[in-house]
Each structure stands twice: as structure tokens, then as C-alpha cells.
């Protein structure tokens, strides 16, 4: 509900209400657009008598890797693994479709975050691919991403990420309150300006209060 990287799209398929869920940045936009356009052409007579999602999948879903599930836990986990979920009014079960479009870094690894083993990708300048990179590695339904706008002129995107079942709720409320209460015109130095704006001003503490990663 609160994660800004979880997006949904409502359809009317043959007179029946339907909804598609996908994690922003995980789905292939071109594939999902083509499938959505096809579903919108279906008429009521095309879905008359259908009561099972498996029958709908066999007729009108062309993804090679797709399946039906009745388990809500399996459905949620599959969405966070990159699959798209379709639910249609009057059909038992939901369809899971593999239309992944994982983001990948096309430039060099971060100069300040080199690793000897493991992946060499890093954060980029766009917030949606960065959220998808985090979601790709932390496939926990408790991972929540709250989107905020900061800066009365620049309207910079700021995302508050946390595990809902592990986070210190008092600290989370304080951080959220500071983000919502910021009164700045712009973040000229991006994350450095944001950290400077939300952290307490204590001149007598020489140690860093914020860690950065690329």
C-alpha cells in the first residue's frame, strides 16, 4: 500500500474489472503495453462462462512463462521476484506473468565503491532504477519505499526505504516528519544537502552521522 515503487493498472476486460500489479522498473513496458492493448479488445462474449483464471490464461495470455496461483503468499513473493500479477473479476486465482525488465547499469562501476567479488553495478541518477536495484536484491514484502518531493523549486525525488517489520518506528517517524517539514528551495548537492537539512546541528561531535554509498 505505501510503497511508491508498487504500481497498478486497471482494465476492463470483456466487461469485467481487472487489475495488473508490477514493481516499477521490473516489468518490460513494451510487452505489458501490448498485452494490455490486446486485453482491451476483448468483448463480453470472449469471456462469457469463464470462472477459472487458468482458462483465461490458456486463451488470452501469451507469455511463455506464466502460471496461476491461489496462494496469496506465493503471489506476493512472485511479484517481488519481478513477475507481473493479473487479477480478473469473477475468475478464481491470479495469473503470474514473467515480463521482467530488470535495470542494468550501462556505465562503469562506482569509483568509490569498488568490489573484488559480486556484482559491479551501482546507483544511477534516476530514482526508479535505483529502487528496482534495491528491490531486486531485497525480495522482502516488508521492504517499503515512501516517495517524497523535496525543494520548493527543484522538487527533487527523495525515497525513504526501510523494512517495515525491523525499523525503529520512533526514528522512522522523526525522519518522515523532517522530510515532510523541510522548507528548502533546492538540493544543490543532492544527498549531501538532504543530510545536512535533516540531521541535528551539533558542532561538538566530530564524527560522521551519515554514511553514503554508490
Language-model features: where?
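Cytosolic regulatory modules rich in charged/polar residues
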Residues: 1-214
Amino acid at each position: 500500500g505505501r510503497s511508491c515503487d508498487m504500481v497498478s493498472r486497471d482494465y476492463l476486460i470483456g466487461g469485467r474489472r481487472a487489475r495488473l500489479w508490477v514493481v516499477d522498473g521490473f516489468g518490460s513496458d513494451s510487452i505489458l503495453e501490448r498485452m494490455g492493448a490486446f486485453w482491451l479488445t476483448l468483448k463480453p462474449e470472449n469471456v462469457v462462462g469463464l470462472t477459472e483464471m487458468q482458462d483465461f490464461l490458456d486463451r488470452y495470455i501469451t507469455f511463455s512463462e506464466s502460471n496461476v496461483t491461489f496462494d496469496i503468499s506465493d503471489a506476493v513473493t512472485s511479484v517481488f521476484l519481478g513477475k507481473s500479477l493479473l487479477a480478473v473479476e469473477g475468475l478464481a486465482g491470479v495469473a503470474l506473468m514473467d515480463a521482467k525488465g530488470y535495470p542494468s547499469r550501462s556505465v562503469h562501476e562506482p569509483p568509490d565503491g569498488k568490489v573484488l567479488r559480486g556484482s559491479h553495478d551501482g546507483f544511477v541518477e534516476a530514482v526508479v532504477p535505483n529502487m528496482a536495484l534495491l528491490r531486486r536484491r531485497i525480495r522482502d514484502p516488508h521492504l517499503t519505499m515512501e516517495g517524497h518531493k523535496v525543494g520548493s523549486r527543484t522538487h527533487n525525488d527523495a525515497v525513504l526505504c526501510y523494512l517495515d517489520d525491523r525499523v525503529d518506528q520512533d526514528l522512522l517517524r522523526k525522519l518522515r516528519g523532517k522530510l515532510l517539514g523541510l522548507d528548502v528551495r533546492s538540493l544543490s548537492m543532492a544527498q549531501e544537502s538532504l543530510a545536512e537539512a535533516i540531521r541535528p546541528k551539533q558542532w561538538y561531535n566530530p564524527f560522521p552521522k551519515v554514511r553514503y554509498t554508490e
